[in-house]
């Protein structure tokens, strides 16, 4: 089972999300990711491994915003062979959205074709 957290606050949420992910993780986790939103810009950091080794000080400084999502992944199918498979996912079409899901996608090939071959713009992403 994956761990998911969302926080909306009057203060920056990066540290609260990080602390929450530390509490949600356990052995078997293969990747983690945090996305924050500052005004209309998403800030994303994803990495393989455990939370305490995935985020450095510079990563946390870049995750500014008062809205954020965090995810720790426990593979039930496949594994995080690349950071691109870690969540949260950013989808640009039609306007830009960040999403996290807890489950197996059964139409991954169709989704991959749509996301990577058709919708290539990423205007709201800052990494």
Per-range role (PLM):
Residues 1-127:
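Conserved short alpha-helical segments that host acidic/polar catalytic motifs at enzyme active sites
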């Amino acid at each position: 089972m994956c761990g998911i957290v969302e926080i909306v606050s009057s203060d920056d949420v990066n540290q609260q999300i990080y602390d929450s992910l530390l509490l949600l993780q356990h052995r078997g986790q293969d990747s983690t990711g945090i996305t924050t939103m500052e005004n209309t810009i998403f800030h994303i950091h994803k990495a393989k491994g455990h939370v305490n080794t995935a985020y450095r000080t510079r990563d946390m400084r870049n995750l500014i915003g008062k809205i954020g999502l965090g995810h720790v992944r426990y593979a039930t199918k496949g594994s995080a062979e690349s950071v691109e498979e870690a969540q949260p996912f950013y989808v640009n079409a039609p306007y830009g959205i960040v999403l996290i899901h807890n489950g197996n996608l059964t139409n991954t090939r169709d989704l991959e074709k749509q996301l990577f071959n058709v919708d290539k713009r990423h205007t709201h992403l800052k990494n």
